[in-house]
Amino acid sequence: MVNNRISESTTTAVSNNGSPPKACAGCGGKIADRFLLYSMDRYWHTRCLKCSCCQAQLGEIGTSCYTKSGMILCRNDYIRLFGNSGACNACGQSIPASEMVMRAQGSVYHLKCFTCATCRNRLVPGDRFHYVNGTIFCEHDRPTGLLNGHLNPLQSNPLQGSPMLPDQKVC
């Protein structure tokens, strides 16, 4: 990533059975291993997925790695370089890196701040909601213009960034 966006990714292993060899995002070489590392929408050799600062290998399954300003970072170097907090889109207060958050359309929220703009009920993972012009609405309080629409309920795994219609989300 060349921009200033923050992205957190978890490293996972995927099977390479019967597939043509993939190219490693780090070295460009072919990955002939039985299992591939898949992180940040790219494939890697275990030895090639490293922190840009400390060179720590990030290839352990389940390890979090961060990207910002074109760098791949371990958690410690990310916090050292960019601080340990971001700002909540609702209240503007900082969010420590260790705290769980809710996300919608690139905005980040404290769990307690991810609420319907109308009824103020807190939305939790699995709740359907509508995100209209930066405002969150629960399914019950969605704007009337959406009530007569032809939107079907969506089911998604938000951790994998599945494509969604622009105004209806599932936490």
From Swiss-Prot:
Give me the ranges of the annotated region Disordered: 1-20
Q: Which SUPFAM superfamilies match?
A: Glucocorticoid receptor-like (DNA-binding domain)
Q: Name one GO molecular function term.
A: transcription coregulator activity
> Tell me, which GO biological process terms does this entry list?
cell differentiation; gastrulation; mesoderm development; negative regulation of neuron differentiation; nervous system development; positive regulation of transcription by RNA polymerase II
Q: Per UniProt, which keywords does this protein have?
A: Developmental protein, Differentiation, Gastrulation, LIM domain, Metal-binding, Neurogenesis, Repeat, Transcription, Transcription regulation, Zinc
Protein's job? Acts as a positive cofactor of GATA transcription factors to establish the identity of the ventral mesoderm during gastrulation. Down-regulation in the dorsal mesoderm is necessary for the proper formation of this territory since, when present, lmo4 may bind ldb1 and restrict the availability of this cofactor for Spemman organizer transcription factors. At neurula stages, suppresses primary neuron differentiation and modulates gene expression at the Isthmic Organizer of the midbrain-hindbrain boundary.
What is the protein's given name? Answer: LIM domain transcription factor LMO4-B
* Organism, scientific name: Xenopus laevis (African clawed frog)
Gene symbol of the encoding locus: lmo4-b
